[in-house]
UniProtKB/Swiss-Prot annotation:
Family the UniProt entry places it in: Belongs to the RRF family.
Encoding gene (name): frr
Species of provenance: Mycobacterium ulcerans (strain Agy99)
Name of the featured protein: Ribosome-recycling factor
Any Pfam family hit: RRF
GO molecular function: ribosomal large subunit binding
């Protein structure tokens, strides 16, 4: 029972870090990055589908993204979705591909994006701590029900705390790295 509770908590914490990593990838830095388009979806034959599944996305230059749809008839829909997104970029359509020039970020915009990154990092930390709290409740229930001894539960709690600190440190590192990317001119 203890091993199950720890494994379940660790799996959920890993997922929280993975979500934080995806969130950080969607925050635009001054450089072109295919990940910035991962959350943009279009209506593809009645289904909301991410652009990343409908087109190849390449970065030929530091500030240029080239998007080549697998189906030419999706070109306009992809262009419109990018234009309507919150990325602050203006795509140009040449009939076969979409070019997206990534503009230089202003100092004010950089600060806003750093705040956004810190906020997403804090959400991920809270998520990890909530997972820890639920796992601790499960461990206390196991001890109360007599399914495991005091020493086993105490050891499991230490392991859980160690895992929690490890995952929080990973999230902190993601935020720090993103902050460095954003403030780099």
């Amino acid at each position: 029972m203890i091993d199950e509770a720890l494994f379940d908590a660790e799996e959920k914490m890993e997922k929280a870090v993975s979500v934080a990593r995806e969130d950080m990838a969607t925050i635009r830095t001054g450089r072109a990055n295919p990940g910035m388009f991962s959350r943009i979806v279009i209506d593809y034959y009645g289904t909301h589908t991410p652009i990343t599944q409908l087109a190849s996305i390449n970065v030929p230059e530091a500030r240029m993204v080239v998007i080549k749809p697998y189906e030419a008839n999706q070109l306009h829909a992809i262009e419109t979705a990018i234009r309507n997104s919150d990325l602050g970029v203006n795509p140009t359509n040449d009939g076969t591909i979409i070019r997206v020039a990534v503009p230089q970020l202003t100092e004010e915009r950089r600060r806003d994006l750093v705040k956004q990154a810190k906020h997403k990092g804090e959400e991920a930390r809270v998520s990890v701590r909530n997972i820890r709290r639920k796992a601790m409740e499960e461990l206390h229930r196991i001890r109360k029900d007599g399914e495991a001894g005091e020493d086993e539960v105490a050891r499991a709690e230490k392991d859980l705390d160690k895992s929690t600190h490890q995952y929080v440190a990973q999230i902190d590192e993601l935020v720090k790295h993103k902050e460095g990317d954003l403030l780099e001119v």
